[in-house]
C-alpha cells in the first residue's frame, strides 16, 4: 500500500483546571478531553524522493516546518531512518475542516494522523503507547489525538488515563472567524492573575487530582449520565479569555440561552460549544443561536462526540 487517507477528529475539553507551575515552564493540568466527529482529512503517500512535501489545499496554513504535520513527518524520519531509507519520502495532503487557532486541537490532530499514517505506510507496527510517546515530543494534545475517545489528561496534558466512552452527546460548536486566542497568552495571563492560588507542591496537586477523579464529572462519565456530565463541565481559562474577548463571552451567553445541557469554551478558545442529548435538540439550539446572534463573522457546526481518534478512511 503506497498511500493512506485518515480522519483526524477534533477534540473539546469537558474540563480544564490549572493546578500550578511545572519546572519545565508549562502548567500542571487536569483535563477531560473528548473527541468529536468534526475532523480533518490527511493523506500520506510515498513520493519516491527523500523529501517531505506538504500540501494544505485552500488553507492558509504553512507547508513547511512551522506546520505540526510536517514536524510529525520529520520526527518519524529522525526516529526511523532505516524505514525512510527503505520507503523514501512522503507527500502529505491536508484537507482542513477543523477551524484553526480555535481550542479544538486541529494542528495536533493533523500531526497525530501523520504519525499514524507513516507507521502504516512504513509497516513499523508501532503500538499506541509507542505512538503516544512520539507524539508527546511534538505537543501536549497530540498523544490524546492518537487514540481519542474520552480521557483524563494530566501533567501538561500528555499523561492519559482512558475513561469509559463518553460518546453520548450532540454538540453545537461556534467560533468567530476573526478572533484567534494565543494559547501561551491565555496561560501566561492566567498565571499573572491567579498564580497566587497555585498548588505548587506535589502533595497538594496529588490530593486535588484525587478529588477530581472522585468528583461528579468523572462519576457522570462512568455512569454515562449526560445531565450530570454537562452540569459539571469547567474551564479555568474562561476566567481570562472571556473578559478579554467580549464577543466570545457574548457568543457563550447566546449559546447557553438557546438551550441544551451545558455550554463552555473549549481549551484556550475562542470556540464555544453546547452539549445536547439528541440531534433534534442540537438542531434547535443551533437555529435559535443563529437567529439571536445574526453575526456573519460566526461559523457554526453541528457534530457529535465519538469514541475514537485517528482512523483510516480508506486503504
Swiss-Prot record:
Q: Which SUPFAM superfamilies match?
A: GHMP Kinase, C-terminal domain (SSF55060), Ribosomal protein S5 domain 2-like (SSF54211)
Q: What are the entry keywords?
A: ATP-binding, Isoprene biosynthesis, Kinase, Nucleotide-binding, Transferase
Q: Name one GO biological process term.
A: isopentenyl diphosphate biosynthetic process, methylerythritol 4-phosphate pathway
| Class in the EC hierarchy, top level | transferase
EC annotation from Swiss-Prot or TrEMBL = 2.7.1.148
Name the active site residues: 11, 141
Pathway in which the depicted protein is active? Isoprenoid biosynthesis; isopentenyl diphosphate biosynthesis via DXP pathway; isopentenyl diphosphate from 1-deoxy-D-xylulose 5-phosphate: step 3/6
Q: Which domain of life is it from?
A: Bacteria
Catalytic function, reaction form: 4-CDP-2-C-methyl-D-erythritol + ATP = 4-CDP-2-C-methyl-D-erythritol 2-phosphate + ADP + H(+)
Give binding positions for ATP: 99-109
Q: Per the record, a Pfam family?
A: GHMP_kinases_C
Q: Which InterPro entries match?
A: GHMP_kinase_C_dom, GHMP_kinase_C_sf, GHMP_kinase_N_dom, IspE, Ribosomal_Su5_D2-typ_SF, Ribsml_uS5_D2-typ_fold_subgr
**Any one GO molecular function term:** ATP binding
What job does this protein perform?
Answer: Catalyzes the phosphorylation of the position 2 hydroxy group of 4-diphosphocytidyl-2C-methyl-D-erythritol.
Note the HAMAP family from the entry.
IspE
Instruction: Please give the family membership noted in the entry.
Output: Belongs to the GHMP kinase family. IspE subfamily.
**Any idea what this protein is called?**
4-diphosphocytidyl-2-C-methyl-D-erythritol kinase
**Organism, per UniProt?**
Synechocystis sp. (strain ATCC 27184 / PCC 6803 / Kazusa)
Amino acid at each position: 500500500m503506497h498511500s493512506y487517507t485518515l480522519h483526524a477528529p477534533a477534540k473539546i475539553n469537558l474540563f480544564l483546571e490549572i493546578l500550578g507551575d511545572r519546572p519545565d515552564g508549562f502548567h500542571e493540568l487536569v483535563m477531560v478531553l473528548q473527541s468529536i466527529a468534526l475532523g480533518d482529512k490527511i493523506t500520506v503517500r510515498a513520493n519516491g524522493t527523500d523529501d517531505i512535501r506538504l500540501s494544505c489545499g485552500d488553507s492558509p496554513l504553512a507547508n513547511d516546518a512551522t506546520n505540526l504535520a510536517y514536524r510529525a513527518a520529520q520526527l518519524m524520519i529522525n526516529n526511523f531512518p532505516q524505514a525512510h531509507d527503505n520507503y523514501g519520502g512522503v507527500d502529505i495532503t491536508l484537507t482542513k475542516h477543523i477551524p484553526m487557532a480555535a481550542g479544538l486541537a486541529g494542528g495536533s490532530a493533523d500531526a497525530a494522523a501523520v504519525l499514524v499514517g507513516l507507521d502504516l505506510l512504513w509497516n513499523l507496527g508501532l503500538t499506541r503507547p509507542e505512538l503516544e510517546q512520539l507524539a508527546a515530543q511534538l505537543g501536549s494534545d497530540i498523544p490524546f489525538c492518537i487514540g481519542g475517545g474520552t480521557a483524563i489528561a494530566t501533567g501538561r496534558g500528555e499523561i492519559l488515563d482512558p475513561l469509559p466512552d463518553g460518546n453520548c452527546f450532540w454538540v453545537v460548536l461556534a467560533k468567530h472567524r476573526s478572533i484567534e486566542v494565543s494559547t501561551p497568552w491565555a496561560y501566561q495571563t492566567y498565571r499573572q492573575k491567579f498564580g497566587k492560588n497555585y498548588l505548587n507542591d506535589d502533595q497538594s496537586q496529588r490530593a486535588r487530582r484525587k478529588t477530581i477523579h472522585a468528583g461528579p464529572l468523572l462519576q457522570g462519565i462512568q455512569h454515562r449520565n449526560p445531565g450530570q456530565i454537562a452540569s459539571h463541565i469547567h474551564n479555568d481559562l474562561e476566567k481570562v479569555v472571556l473578559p478579554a474577548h467580549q464577543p466570545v463571552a457574548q457568543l457563550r451567553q447566546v449559546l447557553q440561552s438557546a438551550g441544551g445541557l451545558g455550554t463552555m469554551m473549549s481549551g484556550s478558545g475562542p470556540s464555544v460549544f453546547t452539549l445536547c442529548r439528541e440531534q433534534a435538540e442540537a438542531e434547535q439550539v443551533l437555529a435559535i443561536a443563529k437567529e439571536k446572534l445574526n453575526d456573519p463573522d460566526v461559523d457554526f457546526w453541528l457534530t457529535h462526540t465519538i469514541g475514537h481518534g485517528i482512523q483510516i478512511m480508506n486503504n
